[in-house]
Structure formats: structure tokens, C-alpha cells
A protein has these predicted regions:
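N-terminal, positively charged/glycine-rich alpha-helical extensions of SAM-dependent methyltransferases
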Residues: 5-26
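Conserved alpha-helix/loop element of class I SAM-dependent methyltransferases that forms part
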Residues: 34-53
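A short acidic, Gly/Pro-enriched loop at the edge of an enzyme's catalytic core
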Residues: 110-121
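A short glycine-rich, Lys/Arg-flanked "PGG" loop and its adjoining helix->strand segment in the class I
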Residues: 134-146
């Protein structure tokens, strides 16, 4: 089945992204309201579909741990590998890392070598920063066990569209149809959800 690997309209500066997120570690939990909502909804969905304990989990783009903490509480993984492009994010997991419950791999998930044999690969609010999510989907398939799960959330084309229209800059967001086309090559799609979220708490 053919697939179109889409080229970014604008290059993504990973070094700039790393610097900006590194500076935001202390304020992230306060500012990332939408990301927190998304992580909690993802946790609820995973809790519905996945067996427990889940075995080996790889989380891409862990951030400060919105999803990580829920995974520990609900899926009880035997081994948890956390990844974020910012090394500074590891400071949010000193308890998990110190106890040996998790390991942390800092770096660009599109090129970083990850351990194979995962029962679940999960990512919340990170794939919009990738140069080629399609190639990453393919790669994740090689890291999963047979009958393993790949679950992710990303932002759609309505995200910050007003800002992009004014500034003329922004990320190239895949449509739901484009994502599904790329996923069907390697995965059986269990469920898809598209939700509008509030960016700020009131």
C-alpha cells in the first residue's frame, strides 16, 4: 500500500526547540493546561484498552510527567523508558529514576536508538515537532512486540491557526486522514478520537 511521506513546509529547528523547552521546565506544569488535559484523556483511553500490568513501556516526549505518573498508577509497567528532547526534564523523575522504576533517554526521538521489545509506545503532544511522523510510525513498528500497542496524540490543523495567519509561520500539521493513511500500513487502528480543548483554565 503506497504512502506519501510529506515534506515539512518549514524546517524544524530541533536545537531551538530544545533550548526553549529547557528554559520552560519550571513553568511548564503551570502553563501547559491543554497538554495536561490531553495526557489525562490518553491515560483513560489506555486504561480502557490495555492489559495490566503492561510490561515494557516507552514514552516519547515525556515532558514533566503528566502522562508518566498516570501510567505508573494505572498500567503498572514492569519497565518504563522515558524520552524527552531536553535532558533537563529528567529532574522531574528523580524518584522513578532513583528507585530503578524508570530510565531516561534524552535526545531527538526521530534519531535516538531505543530498546526493542516494547509492549506499548506512547506519545502525548510531541509528534507535531517531528520532521516526519510517518517515518517514526514505521520505526515504532520495529520496536514493538507482536501485538504491541502504539498510541499517540498530536495537534490538528486548527491549532494556533490565528497566530499562524498573522505571523505567517507555524508548524505543518497533518490532517487526520493523512495520519490514518500512514498508520494503516503498519498497524490495525483500534480507535481514533478528535477533540477540541480549551487552551487555558478559567
Amino acid at each position: 500500500m503506497p504512502v506519501c511521506y510529506l515534506k515539512q513546509k518549514r524546517m524544524i529547528n530541533k536545537q531551538l526547540i530544545t533550548r526553549r523547552f529547557s528554559r520552560a521546565v519550571e513553568s511548564y506544569n503551570r502553563e501547559a493546561v491543554a497538554q495536561k488535559q490531553i495526557a489525562y484523556r490518553m491515560s483513560d483511553m489506555l486504561n480502557h484498552y490495555l492489559p495490566r500490568p503492561c510490561g515494557r513501556i516507552l514514552e516519547i516526549g515525556s515532558g514533566t510527567g503528566f502522562l508518566t505518573r498516570r501510567l505508573m498508577e494505572t498500567l503498572h509497567p514492569e519497565k518504563l523508558v522515558l524520552n524527552d528532547i531536553c535532558q533537563e526534564m529528567s529532574s522531574c523523575f528523580t524518584d522513578l529514576l532513583g528507585s530503578g522504576q524508570a530510565t531516561f533517554l534524552a535526545g531527538d526521538a526521530e534519531s535516538l536508538p531505543f530498546p526493542k521489545g516494547q509492549d506499548l509506545i506512547v506519545s502525548c503532544s510531541a509528534l507535531q515537532w517531528f520532521v516526519s511522523p510517518e517515518l517514526f510510525f514505521e520505526r515504532c513498528n520495529t520496536l514493538l512486540k507482536q501485538k504491541g500497542y502504539f498510541a499517540f496524540t498530536t495537534f490538528g490543523r486548527d491549532n494556533l491557526k490565528e497566530v499562524a495567519s498573522v505571523t505567517g509561520s507555524g508548524l505543518h500539521y497533518r490532517s487526520l486522514e493523512e495520519l490514518e493513511e500512514a498508520l494503516r500500513i503498519h498497524y490495525e487502528i483500534v480507535t481514533v478520537s478528535y477533540t477540541h480543548l480549551r487552551a487555558h483554565e478559567t
